[in-house]
Amino acid sequence: MTLLPKTHVGAMCAALGIGFLTLSGSILAQDASPTLEPGADIFDPAVAEATPIPGVETFEVESAAHTTDPVEYPQDPPAGGPHDPSWQRCAVYDAPVRPENAVHAQEHGAVWITYEPDLPESDREILTQLAENQPYLLISPYPGLEDPVVASAWGARLRLDDVSDPRLTAFIDRYAGNGPERGATCDTGVETTIDEG
């Protein structure tokens, strides 16, 4: 049996270690998400529809243009479309917010939960609790809402009769952070509200 000098053993261990790290890095890199080309659309509706949530309506969003003009949206409340250059900060509001600002937040990945202004306080408290530790949730009253609660995201909407419906949390889990500008902030932005009358 031939023994190698200690210096050779150390060099071999170092080479094996580097080789292992290189191999591990290659394996990890292969498991990572693919790198997107600059300008690629990172919002993939197919991912959002992988396991359908009963009652979710999906929409093809025609435009994401910025405008300072009021927008008439095909859905009420809106689920994407042209929007104000300023996004609404994701938070819980006691008064309605401008849809054009909320839609910009949806583009960043926000789920906008709207509710009837006369929703009981106990139900509003449940909605407020949902917003804890969820940076992509925007909650506000919405005058004229046809359902007690509606959750809207970019290209998707869920109408609900009850804030405790488990589909609401499933919708948030599915769509929060999944907008065309995924990764854009929602914890800053405008905080203005509008008058109901």
What does each model-identified segment do?
Residues 40-103:
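Surface-exposed, low-hydrophobicity interaction/linker segments
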Residues 76-78, 116-118, 144, 154-157:
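Solvent-exposed coil/turn segments that connect beta secondary-structure elements
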